[in-house]
Regions:
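Short, structured segments at the rim of ligand-binding sites
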Residues: 1-119
Length: 119
């Protein structure tokens, strides 16, 4: 089932269902991308591994609301500059190199010190 979505104009409202397999790397990326999107993003079949939970905890530390139920996970993104925190923070990426690499790119312009722990 290969379908391509081509976007030719600015998106104001994107309501499309995309079905992918439950995968750790995709789940981490979904959490991070959803956190910088504007509005609510919902994922079904999200892999709830230790690394994905670390990504969820990381965006929560950055002021993003995340709702987890038995059926789905919702991230309430605040846009590309929506991370809100008023002090130096520590983000524990656990053992996730994917989370560590990707979140540094999102936080590169922070005016606060950010300590990233990966073990």
């Amino acid at each position: 089932m290969n379908k391509t979505i081509v976007i030719k104009k600015k998106i104001h409202d994107f309501k499309k269902t995309i079905t992918v397999s439950s995968d750790k790397s995709l789940s981490i990326r979904w959490v991070l991308f959803s956190s910088i999107a504007s509005g609510k993003s919902t994922a079904y079949n999200l892999l709830m591994s230790e690394d994905v939970l670390a990504a969820i905890n990381a965006v929560r530390k950055l002021g993003i609301k995340v709702k987890i139920t038995k059926k789905f996970c919702q991230v309430f993104g605040k846009g590309i500059e929506g991370f809100k925190y008023k002090k130096d923070i520590t983000i524990n990426a656990k053992n996730s190199g994917t989370l560590g690499r990707l979140i540094l790119g999102l936080l590169i312009n922070s005016k606060y010190k950010i300590k990233l722990i990966i073990y």
